[in-house]
């Protein structure tokens, strides 16, 4: 599903990504770990076409993140820890707006289905500025799933969630993970390792470790992660 070769992204003289290379098979779940400034979010932004790489290449579903960006956006979804929603629209209006952008058939049916899945159907007519952070994140998840993406990118999706919202997100991931590829940034080692089929640790824009879950010895993995925390920004 992902083919990354020598991926580099520079901001001035600093390389937020420095020759990153890895492959991820279809229907895998990759958890990405690393300290602040390691390049995790920059990696996701490049892979979701929000940033252009300075050099190197990346393909998602065989599509180049630069040359095939328009087509690729139709087949991927992004769940951010900062929900991308309009505060002065209702929950239903938010989802219908994005459904129209994606050209979804029978948008009201799809929106109703997702509002029920994230347990917000009873709040569908309420303005989202009245929602708690957990509710906003749940609605953001519904938005990301509207067009049935094949690859889902999750940027710290559990950050700031209440226990109920965490349970809902766990359930949604369990329900769809067999048919999707996931890339999740996480600061929670336990949750990230619980979910993943592959794990990646970054520091200073580079890959420190990339292994399938079955090859990981948890204590050694924790030691490697702790060693990167003091490395800071490149």
Locate predicted features.
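The feature captures the beta-strand-to-loop junction immediately N-terminal to the Walker
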Residues: 33-35
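Helix-to-loop junction immediately C-terminal to a conserved catalytic motif
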Residues: 48
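Conserved ABC ATPase "signature" region
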Residues: 96, 100-123
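Conserved H-loop
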Residues: 180-185
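A short, surface-exposed alpha-helical micro-motif characterized by mixed small hydrophobic
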Residues: 192-194
